Amino acid sequence: MYDGKQVVRVVTQYKKADLYNIGVEMTDRKGTGNYDKDRTIFNIEYVSLTQNNLYQEVKNNLKTRNIEYLNRPNTNLLNGVTFTSGPEFFQSLGMKFKNSGRTYHTGDKKGQTVMIPDIKSKGDITKAVSYFFDSCMEFLKEYVGEENILLSQIHYDEDTPHLQAYFVPVVTKVKRKCFVKDENGNVVKEEIKKKDGTTSIVPKLLRDDKGKIVYEEVNGKFLNCDQFWKDKGGLSLIH
């Protein structure tokens, strides 16, 4: 039995400017990886794009599902997750590896040979390996919501097999700051002094007896990365 590590890597801060490169890497297999074109045909697609590119996919998904979000350059539109392990794990599941002719330059394996999957036909991908990735995908669908997953693939054409997926972090409840209102229901404004010495007119926050800001819970469908992971108990729970 293999006792090494299985890796789950999550990235939570993909913004509009990041989506083009992600889409190119996933659909055209161009990017920072070591791609073997002879093995690309063995990649598996769980969830495919329905639009021309990843950004349009995100926009279409949010629009058709009536999901509220802040349309700003710094909005975290997408989360990414990768399930993988070292060659030893996949070898323990019956997959053959071969010498790449390269060595690791950093990390625990510095100086050691980089072993890559030896795949020449679908039969070289064992049922145990397929089951591992199928199980990862089922876990992901249950954990983040199948309807939130926009793109998901198994990549056998890089140095190490991995499942790579992208999803929108959608929640059904958010907490919003409350503001002081006058007798007519209008938000009260106040003048504040900034650090640079200038002043600004802003809505006056509602505070409790202890001076803490009062929040209200709002129901609906919202794209909110911070709240998504707070609801999950934090990123550490997925590792």
Regions found by a protein language model. Give the residues of each.
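N-terminal nicking endonuclease/strand-transfer module with a His-rich metal-binding environment
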Residues: 1-238
